[in-house]
Structure formats: C-alpha cells, structure tokens
Amino acid sequence: MPELPEVETTRRGIDTVITGRTLRRLVVREARMRWPIPPALPDLLAGRTVLECGRRGKYLLLRFDHGVQIVHLGMSGSLRRVPEQEAPRKHGHVDWVFDHAVLRLHDPRRFGAVLWHPDEAGPIAAHPLLARLGIEPFDPRFDGRWLHAYFRGRRVAIKQALLAGDAVVGVGNIYASESLFRAGIDPRTAAQRVSAARCDRLAAAIRATLSDALDSGGSTLRDYVGASGEPGAYFAIHAAVYERAGLPCRVCGAPIRRLVQGQRATYFCPSCQKR
C-alpha cells in the first residue's frame, strides 16, 4: 500500500502541474472503487480551478473554490502524469484533464477512492475519513513525549499501535518495521511498556525513516510509481529488515526474522531489537 512517503511524493509531483490550473474535465471510466465515485462529480468539477494540492495522512486533498476532492491510492494505486494522447490501459480508471496535462489514476485492485467534500459540509478536517487521524510525523509537536502519552495504558504490540494511525499518521507496514529497527525496539513489545527514553528514540527513528523515504521517492515493491512514472528507490537503497527474512542483519549479522501481527508481515532483528 502507498504510505505517507509515496503519497507525499505524488503530491509534490502533481502540485506544480495542477495548482492554479483549471480542470477541463474529469473522466471516470470505472466508478466502482472502494466507495463509488459520485456520478455528479465530473459536472461539479469541470471548469473549476485547483487552488491547492494538499495531503493529510495517506489522503491527497485537491482544494477547489467550492469544496475538496479526496483521493486515496488504495492498496496498489498510483496517480501520474500521462501524455494526453496516451490511450488508457487496463486499470486506468480516472483522468483529470487540464489544458496542459493529464493525470491518470491507475488502481488494479480498486481499493482507492475519489470522493467529494463540499464546503457546505463543513471543514475538511471533520470529514469521517480524516477526523480521527493522528498527528503528522513532521509536525513540530510530534516527539517522544507525544508517543509516550499516547501509549500509556495500551497493551497492544507497539507495531500495531503505530499502524493504527491515531497516534501518528502515515507509518504503514514497511516504515513501521524499519522505524522500530532503527529505534532498537522489538515489534512485539506492548506499547505501554515502551519507556519515555525509547519513545524519544522511536519518534526520531520515524522521522529519519520517513525522511529517507521521501528523499528516495518512496518505495516500490510492486505497483507504485510517482507522478512522473518513476518507481520509488527507498526499498532498494535503505531497507534494513523489510522483506529480508533469513538474510543477515546489516548491523549484527543475525538472521532477520519474519512474523505475522494483525495479518500483516513484520520483519525484525531479534538481536538488535529488544523488548
């Protein structure tokens, strides 16, 4: 699934292309996404100008003068610029057509979303998909004290607490494993047992891991590409544990282990990461 670095890389890639530009038309070839695309949406947006291209967690937020379009890339989606004359291939479900550019949403599994939040419905932050999201990892308020306060009384394993997204957003499966490795924390540790000092290390590790991923254009394991069609390079360059089961730890040489937590694969070094 595209995580925060992949979504932010996409946002940066399309921001200068569409912000301040008028949408000529929205072409919906397949409306059956995670939630059906509203049939009135093309008419609502035709001829309107994109005022801002934002992001909250893993959601892209395209601000128009009468509302916000919410775009989620789902499990396997990508949003990239394509030549206007390029015929849509299989799974090219939605096009945003501008005078100078076309953006295409490619989503093989159709778990993505293209939704509309009109201004009269209230602030976008109150939308049900966004209202309960945690703090952004690069928000100045996010630190070890924030995590330690959130983890107090939480018996769930630390990795699952990170994936929940209500403490801090955007730390999905890949980056949770990588961040816990950097912080030296066993992913099976109960969240409430992580000390304040270790929470400091974890907050720093999350920021460092996500920064590396952003600098690398995200991670590509299967389907993800950025707005220009380039795959992300983080996994190939930086991954210390993810999908390295049985291979030697890059720090101590012990075999990397794989386990399943909450139906998600977790990778860790049993020597470097302590409970």
Swiss-Prot record:
FPG-type ZnF: 240-274
GO biological process terms on file: base-excision repair
Cofactor stoichiometry and binding remark: Binds 1 zinc ion per subunit.
SMART domains with a match to the protein in the record: Fapy_DNA_glyco, H2TH
Transmembrane segments: none
Enzyme Commission designation: 3.2.2.23, 4.2.99.18
Record key words, sorted: DNA damage, DNA repair, DNA-binding, Glycosidase, Hydrolase, Lyase, Metal-binding, Multifunctional enzyme, Zinc, Zinc-finger
Reaction equations catalysed: Hydrolysis of DNA containing ring-opened 7-methylguanine residues, releasing 2,6-diamino-4-hydroxy-5-(N-methyl)formamidopyrimidine; 2'-deoxyribonucleotide-(2'-deoxyribose 5'-phosphate)-2'-deoxyribonucleotide-DNA = a 3'-end 2'-deoxyribonucleotide-(2,3-dehydro-2,3-deoxyribose 5'-phosphate)-DNA + a 5'-end 5'-phospho-2'-deoxyribonucleoside-DNA + H(+)
Named cofactor requirement(s): Zn(2+)
An annotated Gene Ontology molecular function: damaged DNA binding
Record Pfam families: Fapy_DNA_glyco, H2TH, zf-FPG_IleRS
Active-site residue numbers: P2 (schiff-base intermediate with dna), E3 (proton donor), K58 (proton donor), R264 (proton donor)
Database matches in InterPro entries: DNA_glyclase/AP_lyase_DNA-bd, DNA_glyclase_Znf_dom_DNA_BS, Formamido-pyr_DNA_Glyclase, FPG_cat, MutM-like_N-ter, Ribosomal_uS13-like_H2TH, Znf_DNA_glyclase/AP_lyase, Znf_FPG/IleRS
Binding annotation for DNA: H91, R109, R154
CDD domains attached to this UniProt entry: EcFpg-like_N
NCBIfam families membership: fpg, PRK01103.1
Role noted for this protein: Involved in base excision repair of DNA damaged by oxidation or by mutagenic agents. Acts as a DNA glycosylase that recognizes and removes damaged bases. Has a preference for oxidized purines, such as 7,8-dihydro-8-oxoguanine (8-oxoG). Has AP (apurinic/apyrimidinic) lyase activity and introduces nicks in the DNA strand. Cleaves the DNA backbone by beta-delta elimination to generate a single-strand break at the site of the removed base with both 3'- and 5'-phosphates.
Subunit and interaction comment: Monomer.
Family as reported in the entry's similarity comment: Belongs to the FPG family.
Protein name listed in UniProt: Formamidopyrimidine-DNA glycosylase
